[in-house]
A protein has these predicted regions:
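Sec/Tat signal peptide C-region and signal peptidase I cleavage site
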Residues: 7-13
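Low-complexity repeat regions of mature extracellularly deployed or surface/particle-associated proteins
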Residues: 172-216
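Extreme N-terminus of proteins, especially the signal/transit-peptide cleavage junction
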Residues: 10, 81-82, 190-194
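Acidic/polar, compositionally biased interaction segments
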Residues: 13-176
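Bacterial N-terminal signal peptides
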Residues: 1-6
């Protein structure tokens, strides 16, 4: 028997961010159909997770502790396999907005004290092992600043781990080598006990089944 593997090449386990100058309470941003009043980017970079409580300090490297907007974006991979109903929670101060692919899952663009129960999504039916685009907007007008992303994926609420994030979509790479392909080409026309061997390819293109017509 020949063994074959499918390799998943994961990008850096981060999210990309951009910080912008804020414009007071409930500033306009692209997610709510508006545009940034001051679209000049203050800073850019990557973060390993959404787990911040800045208090009255500077938000990331924006040079601001208030009147600031941050857009975090990248990809999130759902663990395990099969269809899952997942709830997301944003612990945020002040407003927050979040999309998974093209679906808005949280939209609470308001002045609030931090608390993830104020920012909770409905159940999102997602597939384990699949990767989705994530887009989070957040702003701070004044006072304390915080942003953390949690999910309920197993029946309990937990911080989304950094391993779930990636800056670019992971690429699935075939583990079938040219040498293995040659071996297949060699054996596929041979007969076993006078019976023809058929080789079929199924699934994602990386799983190969060898079927013998006749004797099992």
């Amino acid at each position: 028997f020949l063994c074959f593997a499918t390799l998943s090449t994961k990008a850096m386990a981060d999210l990309t961010y951009k910080t912008y100058a804020g414009t007071g309470a409930r500033p306009s941003f692209p997610g709510n159909g508006g545009s940034l009043t001051y679209p000049t980017v203050l800073s850019t970079g990557t973060v390993t997770s959404l787990n911040y409580n800045w208090g009255s300090g500077y938000v990331l490297d924006s040079g601001r502790g208030s009147s600031v907007i941050v857009n975090f974006y990248g990809y999130i991979t759902i663990p395990d396999t099969g269809s899952q109903d997942i709830q997301f929670y944003l612990y945020a101060d002040d407003g927050a907005y979040m999309k998974i692919d093209s679906t808005v899952v949280i939209n609470d663009w308001n002045e609030q004290s931090p608390g993830m129960w104020n920012y909770i999504s409905t159940d999102q039916t997602l597939t384990g092992g699949q990767t989705y685009y994530i887009d989070v907007w957040w702003y701070e007008n004044g006072g304390g600043a915080a942003l953390k992303l949690y999910w309920d994926q197993t029946g309990s609420v937990a911080l989304v781990p950094s391993s779930a994030y990636s800056t670019t979509e992971p690429v699935v790479v075939s583990g079938i080598t040219s040498s293995q392909t040659t071996k297949f080409n060699t054996i596929r026309n041979k007969a076993v006990n006078g019976n023809q061997i058929y080789i079929t390819q199924t699934g994602d293109g990386n799983t190969l089944n060898i079927l013998q017509d006749g004797d099992d």
